[in-house]
Amino acid sequence: MSETLPLLLRAARGETVERPPVWMMRQAGRYMKVYRDLRDRHPSFRERSENPDLSYEISMQPFKAFQPDGVILFSDILTPLPGMGIEFDIVESKGPQIGDPIRSLSQVEALRPLQPEESMPFVGEVLGRLRSSVGNQAAVLGFVGAPWTLAAYVVEGKSSKNYAVIKKMAFQEPELLHKLLDHFATSIATYLRYQIDSGAQVVQMFDSWAGQLSPADYDTFAAPYQKKVVDLVKQTHPDTPFILYISGSAGVLERMGRTGVDIISLDWTVDMAEGLARLPDHIGVQGNVDPGLLFGTPEAIRDRIDDCVRKARGRRHILNLGHGILPGTPEENGRAFFEAGKTVMDRIGGA
């Protein structure tokens, strides 16, 4: 019976559900005391995300505290890079650091095809354990970084404010960049298939930095490779709902809808009603409460959730933030978000 499947999975597939499911991007993280305590004992991010016992424990922390409708693998979009021959570290307060940025054809040609079951068996183990632990109480989500965003990190070598290095490559050596993007698209599709086979029921692709592109350049350097990932995954896993998130997506929203994904995750700079009007009816939406609102009062959080859900009524909708929850957010406000999300239909009434 479909009713026994997790609420989030049913909603993501487009079934009629009793309320929008709710989870939060970065719901496992620094705003939770249990996470900070664990981080103090295990200061290396790569250890926390690549040790299966730690990754599993962290993934489950918000589920135990708040019972969200989705439990997402605790990992990072850069986790598959070493399996392709690119080493990285994540430095506290500095973010990702790539030891040897990719700037030449010889470096791109030296990249290995990703074999996740060999280079990242911990991911499969954690996803399987999460499925066993949450059963049908929540959907298990997997995720990846999109080719453009991965390329931005490995070409720049770190986070960037203006993306000058990768844009120089895009406009001076486009063939080189396309070769890198194509390699990432194939490998990321392989990684997503592995996640789904290991237990992920819904997957999300983060193209965090695609919002830094003009619409024309999005069409050239981001969208074709997003679509390649989606097409490859849909060939083997057509029934797994696929979500796409871009930070700062207002300028490319319609274009996102043409990538083949099932659900667009809206950031908070787009009004929910206006965003829906710009997308075809068959595409669902996720979001899109401003994460900054979680520094406000429980009443403000509740009112904004009510407004968001009202505007999305009648469309496939997963309630979420418009970006990851911010460090320093009061943990009780994270709880208030989940509680308000689960009780929203009591306040705004049924369909």
From Swiss-Prot:
<dbReference type="GO" id="GO:0005737">
    <property type="term" value="C:cytoplasm"/>
</dbReference>
<feature type="binding site">
    <location>
        <begin position="26"/>
        <end position="30"/>
    </location>
    <ligand>
        <name>substrate</name>
    </ligand>
</feature>
<comment type="similarity">
    <text>Belongs to the uroporphyrinogen decarboxylase family.</text>
</comment>
<dbReference type="GO" id="GO:0006782">
    <property type="term" value="P:protoporphyrinogen IX biosynthetic process"/>
</dbReference>
<feature type="binding site">
    <location>
        <position position="208"/>
    </location>
    <ligand>
        <name>substrate</name>
    </ligand>
</feature>
<feature type="binding site">
    <location>
        <position position="153"/>
    </location>
    <ligand>
        <name>substrate</name>
    </ligand>
</feature>
<keyword id="KW-0963">Cytoplasm</keyword>
<comment type="function">
    <text>Catalyzes the decarboxylation of four acetate groups of uroporphyrinogen-III to yield coproporphyrinogen-III.</text>
</comment>
<feature type="binding site">
    <location>
        <position position="76"/>
    </location>
    <ligand>
        <name>substrate</name>
    </ligand>
</feature>
<comment type="pathway">
    <text>Porphyrin-containing compound metabolism; protoporphyrin-IX biosynthesis; coproporphyrinogen-III from 5-aminolevulinate: step 4/4.</text>
</comment>
<keyword id="KW-0210">Decarboxylase</keyword>
<feature type="binding site">
    <location>
        <position position="323"/>
    </location>
    <ligand>
        <name>substrate</name>
    </ligand>
</feature>
<dbReference type="Pfam" id="PF01208">
    <property type="entry name" value="URO-D"/>
</dbReference>
<dbReference type="GO" id="GO:0004853">
    <property type="term" value="F:uroporphyrinogen decarboxylase activity"/>
</dbReference>
<keyword id="KW-0456">Lyase</keyword>
<keyword id="KW-0627">Porphyrin biosynthesis</keyword>
<dbReference type="InterPro" id="IPR000257">
    <property type="entry name" value="Uroporphyrinogen_deCOase"/>
</dbReference>
<dbReference type="InterPro" id="IPR038071">
    <property type="entry name" value="UROD/MetE-like_sf"/>
</dbReference>
<feature type="site" description="Transition state stabilizer">
    <location>
        <position position="76"/>
    </location>
</feature>
<dbReference type="InterPro" id="IPR006361">
    <property type="entry name" value="Uroporphyrinogen_deCO2ase_HemE"/>
</dbReference>
<comment type="subunit">
    <text>Homodimer.</text>
</comment>
<protein>
    <recommendedName>
        <fullName>Uroporphyrinogen decarboxylase</fullName>
        <ecNumber>4.1.1.37</ecNumber>
    </recommendedName>
</protein>
